[in-house]
Amino acid sequence: MNKIKILGAVAALSITLAGCGSSASSTSSAASDSGKSGKLRIKFVINGNLGDRSFFDSAYAGLKRTEKDLGYSLKVVELGSDRTKWASGFEDAASGDDYDVLAAGTFDTVDFISKLAPEYPDKKFWLFDAAVDYTGKSGCSNKCANVYSVTFKQNEAAYLAGFLADKLVTAKALPGSPGNGKVGLMGGVKIPVIEDFVVGFKAGFKAAGGNPSSGVLVQYVGGDNPFGDPAKGKEIASAMYAQGADLVWPVAGSSGLGVFESAVAAKRYTFGVDSDQFRTLTDADQRQTVVTSILKNAGNALYLAAKANKAGTLAYGRSAAVGLAEDGVGYVDNANFDKLVPAALRAEVKEQAAKVKSGAVTVPSAF
């Protein structure tokens, strides 16, 4: 059975990265008159699409649980990958009277939520993996009193990934890999939240004894659809493997799906991100490339936020930041992890996690 180091705290929420596809659509598992039924109604507006087998899919799974367990109703609006349509899509979603809570995530949605929250003061807004400005100096004219936002200390989990990566490649522990002491990290685009992954990863790589300047290859998908371009992700990963990388870690939403394809072709390895991608990937060969996944468990975070919201204890008008100490981020310890990572190294990673939690190790951040 998978033992997953994942979220707990009621103050947790998360998210990063737009999915694939381009057309806007909506789905609902609630009746159109759900407002009359007395159910609390969540509208999940995605600046992208479901199907990334990572971040947004995790969020959706958590929100679906609220229907069964907490009596919420859920409507999902997928805005697609065309950024020029996101502003109007959020306007349309917020203008409807078919929700009590509008949930959205990533840095790209901050301006939308900041504008809409004061316009709809009787509604609640959840923003994950980014935070609005609560001072009133910019953004929300009402100081975002009806907005709850949460950021994650992804740098702490990335530190563990970097530590593990260096130890694996230095020991030449991954079967069939060249053992050149190199790894790759593919980000979606160079923004603070992605840079936080990079900074943490390099710090962990260095702490394990590696040289991040020569041992960590970093590249960004970029373009018009940085978090929804699997073809570009495959191209970048293939180039990294050709440069001698034993493994590549995609931090780029569904662009990362191309990395798993490339890993199979190159007979190399990967780390997953945001969800347990050993579990969510459907291709058996791709699954075997996933040594571990570094988690921001959006689904559990949203579920816990919904639980607190229903109880009247969710703190609006402020933001929270959660990391390893709060079980806000973590890593997957499953059968594939046990198979590919020697027991002594598994113990070292656990020890490093404990040091970060206790404050004995302070991980640098891009923020």
Which residues does each PLM region occupy?
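Bacterial lipoprotein signal-peptidase II cleavage site
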Residues: 20-31
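A residue-level marker of the well-folded mature domains of exported/periplasmic proteins
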Residues: 30-367
